[in-house]
Regions:
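Glycine-rich, phosphate-binding/catalytic loops in enzymes
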Residues: 81-83, 237-240, 319
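Active-site acidic catalytic loop and adjacent metal/ATP-binding pocket
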Residues: 46-65, 185-240, 245-247
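ATP-binding pocket architecture of kinase catalytic cores
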Residues: 43-179, 190-197, 215-216
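Short proline/glycine- and basic residue-enriched helix-capping loop/turn segments at helix->loop/beta transitions
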Residues: 180-184
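Juxta-kinase regulatory segment immediately upstream of eukaryotic protein kinase catalytic domains
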Residues: 1-43
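Active-site activation/catalytic loop segments of kinase-like enzymes and analogous catalytic loops
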Residues: 233-276, 294-312
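Helical subdomain adjoining the active site within ATP-dependent kinase catalytic cores
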Residues: 169, 277-342
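A general structural signal marking secondary-structure boundaries and capping sites
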Residues: 32-35, 133, 137-144, 163, ...
Length: 342
């Protein structure tokens, strides 16, 4: 098995399946020369809202191709993705990465199935998810600096305040503040003040990125496009926001209750550092949680605004951005209210 990372000068088509598979075979002829080209079987899984994902299999071995969507480099730092992925693979948190082509990556296959939203809401999974997040945060080293606010500012630079479509422009002007940069700065000041610890984070733990292996009963995470050092509590808060689902308009009434969130944080701390697990730490994390939920909502709201102008995928990013922005305001006000109350 070749393990050295390889680069291939091929573009995989997002529109033509035949052309896409021809290019994939050309790559596999070099990556897996022992495979018989005519016997390679392809299976498509695309569930992400930015990529095309499929597997190529020969005999019992499979590799995964991830083809990047058009214009996704505006919201995803591809160099960072490869660096983060290789670091995670080294520590046992990601499938091996075999190589890259002009518009995507080839990696190993993780056994298991992505969770469904009903499963993610099942309390039996909460502990396993909390445990895996804790293991990730405890295992992968970082320099202790987070990039989350820098990333938001980078997204903002990609956003044109003028939408080409008049209806979209009106919606944007009506539902979003003129100065989004000021919102980022406002949140950043409070987050820095919280002094929450930084860890290596996944930053995108929605249902499709959580894989459960029924045989080993283990939870694994996939898709490291947004993985970078961040506040550990951001990773948890962002995960909590995703119980609302991603298909169509998110339903935030489906998010975990206060008690469920408390239990999740309790499990997380128990698995991360049982010796220093105490009520004081629990209460501090719980107090700061709405602020970090607000931060995650703001991140994805701005991300979705950029996608609304650039993505070729049939998804209503503008309505999604609005749903996230409304939640940002709600969670932020909740945090401010609770701080002023004490």
């Amino acid at each position: 098995m070749a393990t050295e990372f390889q680069t291939f000068n091929e573009d995989l088509s997002l529109t033509s399946q035949t052309e896409c598979e021809d290019s994939a075979r050309a790559i596999l002829a070099k990556l897996r020369p022992e495979w018989t080209s005519s016997e390679i079987k392809f299976e498509y899984f695309s569930v992400g809202i930015t990529n095309k994902i499929f597997s190529a299999g020969f005999g019992t071995e499979h590799v995964i191709f991830r083809v990047f969507g058009h214009n996704t480099s505006k919201v995803i730092d591809r160099e960072n993705e490869v660096t983060a992925w290789r670091q995670l693979a080294k520590h046992g948190f990601a499938a091996p990465l075999y190589g890259k082509f002009n518009n995507g990556l080839i990696c190993g296959f993780l056994e298991g199935k992505s969770l469904k939203i009903e499963q993610m809401r099942d309390s039996r999974f909460h502990m396993n998810i909390a445990k895996r997040i804790a293991q990730l945060h405890a295992s992968v080293p970082t320099n202790g600096k987070t990039l989350v606010f820098e990333k938001m500012q980078e997204f903002l630079k990609q956003l044109d305040p003028k939408f080409e479509d008049a209806t979209k422009q009106e919606f944007f002007v009506t539902n979003f503040p003129q100065n989004l940069a000021a919102e980022i700065e406002k949140v950043e000041k409070l987050v820095i003040k919280s002094k929450e610890p930084v860890a290596f984070c996944h930053n995108d733990l929605l249902v499709h990125n959580i894989v459960f292996n029924g045989e080993t009963k283990r939870i694994e995470f996939i898709d490291y496009e947004y993985a970078f050092p961040n506040y550990a509590l951001y990773d948890i808060a962002n995960h909590f926001c995703e119980y609302a689902g991603v298909e169509g308009t998110p339903d935030y009434t489906k998010c975990l209750t206060k008690d469920e969130k408390w239990l999740f944080i309790n499990d997380y701390l128990h698995f991360k550092d049982s010796k220093n697990h105490c009520d004081v730490r629990m209460k501090a994390m719980y107090k700061h949680l709405p602020l970090f939920e607000a931060t995650a909502h703001l991140f994805w709201a701005i991300w979705a605004l950029v996608q609304a102008q650039n993505s070729t995928i049939d998804f209503d990013y503008l309505t999604y951005a609005h749903a996230r922005y409304e939640q940002y305001e709600k969670r932020f006000q909740k945090y401010i209210g609770s701080v002023n109350h004490h």
